[in-house]
UniProtKB/Swiss-Prot annotation:
Pfam families: RuBisCO_large
SUPFAM superfamilies assigned: RuBisCo, C-terminal domain
UniProt record similarity statement: Belongs to the RuBisCO large chain family.
Alphabetical list of InterPro entries matching this protein: RuBisCO, RuBisCO_lsu_C, RuBisCO_lsu_C_sf
Primary site of residence: mitochondrion
Origin superkingdom: Eukaryota
Naturally occurring in which organism (per UniProt): Arabidopsis thaliana (Mouse-ear cress)
Name the UniProt record assigns to this protein: Putative uncharacterized mitochondrial protein AtMg00280
Further facts: Seems to correspond to a fragment of a former RuBisCO gene. A stretch of 270 kb of the mitochondrial genome is duplicated within the centromere of chromosome 2 resulting in the duplication of the gene. The expression of the duplicated gene (At2g07732) is not demonstrated.
Keywords, sorted A to Z: Mitochondrion
Amino acid sequence: MNNAAKRADCWFGAKNYGRAVYECLRGGLYFTKDDENVNSQPFMRWRDRFLFCAEAVYKAQAETGGIKGHYLNATAGTCEEMIKRAVFARELGVPIVMHDYLNRGIHRKY
């Protein structure tokens, strides 16, 4: 296995989610991805998630010497908001964002 998706609906919170990304990448995976339903939820806001995940990727790369990545879910309710999120990811130096076009704008609660 060389990639993994973590389930965010277990109420991780952004900091712990970033830690899970780091542990996966540090443990040998090449990339991870956000769950399709992760947009911006009360327990994990998108900006915080982006920051902690970017930090995790860079830390894992520095420690392993390998190329690592994480697919950040930039899905939002409007095109303008998605572009805002993608631009923020680019400013963090994150080369990969994903957009769930079938779920766009739908914020599921379990």
